[in-house]
Amino acid sequence: VAPAQLDEILHPILDPASEKKASVIANGLPASPGGAVGVIAFTSEAAMEAAEKGIATILVREETSPEDVEGMRACAGILTQRGGMTSHAALVARGWGKCCIVGCEAMHIDLENKVIKFKGSDKEYHEGDVLSLNGAKGYVYDVAIDTMDASDNPRFVQFMEIVDKFRTMGVRTNADTPEDAARAISFGAEGIGLFRIEHMFYGQNAETPLSKLRKMI
């Protein structure tokens, strides 16, 4: 059993029957599995404002940085023009279990006018237009596709109980918030292995300026 197979069943996915009816408009690297549907948000602030209203978003960026973490947390999925499987967006999204596609080179983003175009098409996509992402395959769609929520899978629990009898090492998690830690513990992690301190200096809960971080380093 490949680890990726276990990972995929723990995420919401696009409904296979609905996805078959849609056409792929672009593809990128499948950085983090799962499915996501939402309206385009070009900034973290826009994603956060939409989340407060109960609106799901796809955060569209050329690439992400630590300053985007609050918007990344608020959105349903992440789509970047640049980046690889070890880019900031990919690493953070996988750590959170959030759908993410990176390196979508066919996408051109005009941030000034808040417009997206995809290679081979003159169609423009604006903030508020719908996108659907298949993070397991790296597919991008311009229609709202039905999703299937992930639920507790008794076979997954049974499998983990079996392999737990034979493992020879402990597993700790990367976590930046109490919510991250609680989620990891629920999946069997035994503690915290890495805490990225730079995330304390960004986002809505950050009270210490970046200069303090630089001084500390």
Regions found by a protein language model. Give the residues of each.
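Non-catalytic helical/linker scaffolds that mediate oligomerization, partner binding
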Residues: 1-217
